[in-house]
């Protein structure tokens, strides 16, 4: 992403400079420990790893809609029922499955990761400020990858019924970021 995460220009040339957020120290980890997944890594995680479809599911966690990702060697904690997959209903996160704070704590301790359906900051191409708005909060998630497709960026997109890679976004859109580190 760019060096200024709150920058809202709709001019492509303004986003030529890439900033490696991995140089920032997080929780005392050395610099260059954390990074953003590539589109290929998102694709592997969501679709291509063994048993990928069984290792993700939409849910509402503590009244927040989102997508849960599970590790390869995941074992479901006792007294928790996890249903993998997507809902057949638009906005059906809570109808599909819901977890309390205590249940989520147990899931998280077992390696589960939650991606909130945080929507995105929309800045329509060719339209001047102040047209910025937030869109899709609690409806869909859109997460940057570190991969480009020409002048655009590739992202992970999900809602309650669908998940996919290659949702192409112009750089002025404000998407969520999930940092990862090698273990």
Task: Briefly describe each language-model feature range.
Residues 23, 35-183:
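C-terminal, surface-exposed recognition/capping segments
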Residues 1-32:
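Short, surface-exposed beta-strand/turn modules with glycine/proline-rich turns
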């Amino acid at each position: 992403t760019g060096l200024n995460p709150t920058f809202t220009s709709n001019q492509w040339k303004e986003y030529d400079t890439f900033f490696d957020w991995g140089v920032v120290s997080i929780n005392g980890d050395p610099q260059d420990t954390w990074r953003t997944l590539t589109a290929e890594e998102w694709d592997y995680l969501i679709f291509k790893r063994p048993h990928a479809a069984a290792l993700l599911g939409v849910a509402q966690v503590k009244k927040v809609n989102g997508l849960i990702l599970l590790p390869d060697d995941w074992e479901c904690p006792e007294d928790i029922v996890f249903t993998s997959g997507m809902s057949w209903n638009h906005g059906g996160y809570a109808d599909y499955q819901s977890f309390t704070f205590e249940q989520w704590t147990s899931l998280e301790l077992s390696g589960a990761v939650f991606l909130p359906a945080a929507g995105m900051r929309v800045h329509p191409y060719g339209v001047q400020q102040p047209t910025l708005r937030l869109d899709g909060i609690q409806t869909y998630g859109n997460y940057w990858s570190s991969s480009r497709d020409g002048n655009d960026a590739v992202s992970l997109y999900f809602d309650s019924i669908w998940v996919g890679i290659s949702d192409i976004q112009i750089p002025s859109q404000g998407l969520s970021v999930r940092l990862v580190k090698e273990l």
